[in-house]
């Protein structure tokens, strides 16, 4: 995925001072720092992006190279042309012929620079949208309509940034060339004009609607197809649905992040579903059937005699078929044996009679209790010794 513009990452314009860049970096770094967002992978990536942008823009030489050649000027492996158009470089990396012509141009009298403001194209920023889904929709798949905050071209100024009836003025610093020459020792280096950002022109009478930005905030409506089997954390990429590019650049992408809401009955674990099934004490002891919910409707679960609390029964094929993989998951039902409450006098008498019959049989009806009591007895005897 193409890198975002470093100025955009820090939220500053291309004419920002060193102090403004440093202040923006501190604000963004604090916002996305991993210590403040534990376990948030998206914030961790944004923090790395902010740190990388600051390392370049806080260094005068790196910033000059970046302003002139884009990402290729500070990272040859980034690919793409030095002008930011995505072309102009051979397979071996960026073409540095412009660098040498700029450096030696004044020394050997080649004169005049490239002339004329240049309009560097910028790819639009990627957008992220969190979409909440019910478990049923996540499992079966669905189509959702979403409204995404974005920026669109200002209809008042047609993207120029200037008030109707006015035009951008020639930059007084570079005289419309878009470049300025900086003397470094014996060399004269040509670099992007810091005042106009290489455009050669400046908006002096800004459009009141967009305040000279050429773009305004808006919301766009999209229909998103959700494949069956998605889970929390899955991302769906919509190519070209991000922020529009600047100066003819391509648009960014939209990443829809799935977040599945908690369910009344089920908890998901990969392809399997888990649920708690309450069973009364008589059914647990004597056996029977209970009705349990599944995503396909209700089914009867057979409870064998002597079922214990937290015993798990598996209903095969009643889970989820994930996006990646062909195995249909299972539904695991954990038994919760309920102790009766609010007993009548007669019910208490019956339970007391029942308890008396259990004591007469030597505890064989409660193997876990008998085993536990034996262990306690041995522990006390050993402790006394």
UniProtKB/Swiss-Prot annotation:
Pfam family, one: DnaJ
Main location class: cytoplasm
Region described as Disordered: 232-251
GO MF terms held by the record: ATP binding; heat shock protein binding; unfolded protein binding; zinc ion binding
Binding-site residues for Zn(2+) 1, renumbered to this chain: 154, 157, 207, 210
Record domain J: where: 5-70
Protein's cellular compartments: Cytoplasm
One of the record's GO cellular component terms: cytoplasm
CXXCXGXG motif repeat copies, ranges: 154-161, 171-178, 193-200, 207-214
Record: residues binding Zn(2+) 2: 171, 174, 193, 196
Source superkingdom: Bacteria
Residues in CR-type zinc fingers: 141-219
Keyword Zinc-finger recorded: yes
Assembly and oligomerization: Homodimer.
Free-text comment about domains: The J domain is necessary and sufficient to stimulate DnaK ATPase activity. Zinc center 1 plays an important role in the autonomous, DnaK-independent chaperone activity of DnaJ. Zinc center 2 is essential for interaction with DnaK and for DnaJ activity.
Similarity section: Belongs to the DnaJ family.
PANTHER family: CHAPERONE PROTEIN DNAJ, DNAJ HOMOLOG 1, MITOCHONDRIAL-RELATED
Function per UniProt: Participates actively in the response to hyperosmotic and heat shock by preventing the aggregation of stress-denatured proteins and by disaggregating proteins, also in an autonomous, DnaK-independent fashion. Unfolded proteins bind initially to DnaJ; upon interaction with the DnaJ-bound protein, DnaK hydrolyzes its bound ATP, resulting in the formation of a stable complex. GrpE releases ADP from DnaK; ATP binding to DnaK triggers the release of the substrate protein, thus completing the reaction cycle.
NCBIfam families documented for this protein: DnaJ_bact (TIGR02349), PRK10767.1 (NF008035)
Protein name: Chaperone protein DnaJ
Organism lineage string: Bacteria, Pseudomonadati, Pseudomonadota, Gammaproteobacteria, Chromatiales
């Amino acid at each position: 995925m193409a890198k975002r513009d470093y100025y955009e990452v820090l939220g500053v314009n291309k004419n920002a001072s060193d102090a403004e860049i440093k202040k923006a970096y501190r604000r963004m770094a604090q916002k996305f720092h991993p210590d403040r967002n534990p376990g948030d992978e998206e914030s961790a990536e944004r923090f790395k992006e902010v740190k990388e942008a600051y390392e370049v823009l806080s260094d005068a030489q790196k910033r000059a190279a970046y302003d002139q050649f884009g990402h290729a000027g500070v990272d040859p492996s980034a690919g793409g042309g030095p002008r930011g158009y995505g072309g102009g470089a051979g397979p071996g990396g960026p073409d540095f012929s412009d660098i040498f012509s700029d450096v030696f141009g004044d020394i050997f009298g080649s004169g005049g620079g490239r002339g004329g403001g240049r309009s560097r194209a910028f790819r639009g920023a990627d957008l992220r949208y969190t979409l909440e889904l019910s478990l049923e929709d996540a499992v079966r798949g669905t189509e959702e309509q979403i409204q995404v905050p974005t920026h669109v071209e200002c209809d008042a100024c047609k993207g120029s940034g200037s008030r109707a009836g006015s035009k951008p003025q020639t930059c007084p610093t570079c005289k419309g060339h878009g470049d300025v020459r900086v003397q470094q020792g014996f060399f004269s280096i040509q670099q992007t004009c810091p005042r106009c950002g290489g455009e050669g022109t400046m908006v002096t009478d800004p459009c009141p609607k967009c305040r000279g930005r050429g773009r305004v905030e808006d919301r766009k409506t999209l229909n998103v197809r959700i494949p069956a089997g998605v889970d929390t954390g899955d991302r769906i990429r919509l190519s070209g649905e991000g922020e529009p590019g600047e100066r003819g650049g391509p648009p960014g992408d939209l990443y829809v992040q799935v977040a599945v809401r908690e369910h009344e009955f089920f908890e998901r674990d990969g392809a399997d579903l888990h649920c708690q099934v309450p069973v009364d004490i008589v059914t647990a002891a004597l056996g029977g059937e209970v009705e349990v919910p599944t995503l396909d409707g209700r089914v009867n679960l057979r409870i064998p005699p002597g079922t214990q609390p937290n015993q798990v029964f598996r209903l095969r094929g009643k889970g989820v078929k994930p996006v990646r993989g062909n195995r249909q998951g299972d539904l695991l039902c954990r038994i919760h044996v309920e102790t009766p409450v609010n007993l009548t006098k007669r019910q208490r008498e019956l339970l007391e009679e029942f308890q008396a019959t259990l004591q007469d049989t030597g505890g064989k009806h409660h193997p876990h209790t008998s085993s536990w009591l034996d262990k306690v007895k041995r522990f006390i005897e050993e402790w006394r010794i």
